[in-house]
């Protein structure tokens, strides 16, 4: 498996990972991974977007992940399984909006 990497590469991996697992619960969920400002090079703030809304909605804090934690553990199946469970729980908690399937078959 793979671990480590530059901040931008790890952010891209995290965005894809969050999208993949969120969409298993809600096909309209989109990942929002905050990497700017004081987070840049240090950490990631993860939220899910459904339409115009974010979850967790500000002022509630996003799911916080440190860059070293993600970079070091993204190759660990156990760590990824735990993160996937957290992301899927966020997606299940998204408020219902719009129409269409919320889950994959």
Q: What does each model-identified segment do?
A:
Residues 1-37, 73-87, 105:
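Negatively charged, low-complexity tracts enriched in Asp/Glu with abundant Ser/Thr
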Residues 34, 47-49:
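Residue-level recognition of well-ordered beta-strand positions that form the cores
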Residues 38-46:
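A short, glycine/Asx- and small/polar-enriched loop/turn
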Residues 50-85, 89-92:
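Intrinsically disordered, low-complexity regulatory segments enriched in Ser/Thr/Pro
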Residues 92, 96-105:
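Intrinsically disordered, low-complexity, Lys/Arg-biased terminal tails
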């Amino acid at each position: 498996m793979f671990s480590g990497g530059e901040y931008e590469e790890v952010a891209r991996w995290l965005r894809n990972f969050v999208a993949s697992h969120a969409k298993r619960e809600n096909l309209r969920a989109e990942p929002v991974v905050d990497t700017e400002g004081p987070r840049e090079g240090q950490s990631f703030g993860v939220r899910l977007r459904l339409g115009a809304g974010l979850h967790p909605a500000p002022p509630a804090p996003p799911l916080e992940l440190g860059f070293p934690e993600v970079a070091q553990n993204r190759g660990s199946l156990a760590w990824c399984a735990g993160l996937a469970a957290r992301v899927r729980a966020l997606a299940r908690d998204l408020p219902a909006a719009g129409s269409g399937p919320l889950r994959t078959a």
